């Protein structure tokens, strides 16, 4: 087999692998419509209709959610936190939803494969790939103190905000939140998101 044929075969296999990895996550990916500001991404966190997205995506109180099958729902903001740029939404669908599969972001290492999914520039269910370039705490423009983040070279654009960052198994390792330096994506680690979301869900289910 020639080098050109080998390269083509590798690209085809890689594309098939990436598509397979993303399918489960796409089931949990939503579009967050926030009026005139446009749209961001979000992720089904719990089967009861709880959704995680970015704080900056939901500054408007009038929100609509579109799911993978094209259904639309009115969303209620049930909690938000500016420090980590996180927000929890709730939709009522009358049926159980498919929550995203989660990884343990505390086990991540620099150099690992990463996939960002979302709706950049209105392109629904788009995927970009890269690696984790650094891990650690950095100051963010909306918070004076340092915040734990994942930085990757997987391309982000408006419409990726609030969408998941996946590992090589298709599990969520973070929530994409901003672009830094023009070419690095920044995500909030999923263990930080879990601490934020779990408290609210546990409180609601305890009532």
Model regions: which residues?
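Gly/Ser-enriched beta-turn/beta-hairpin loop segments
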Residues: 23-24, 78-85, 135-150, 199-204
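C-terminal cap/linker of serine protease catalytic domains
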Residues: 1-22, 75, 97, 116, ...
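Flexible, gly/ser-rich surface segments that form the specificity/activation loops bordering the active-site cleft
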Residues: 100-105, 109-147, 157-160, 177-185
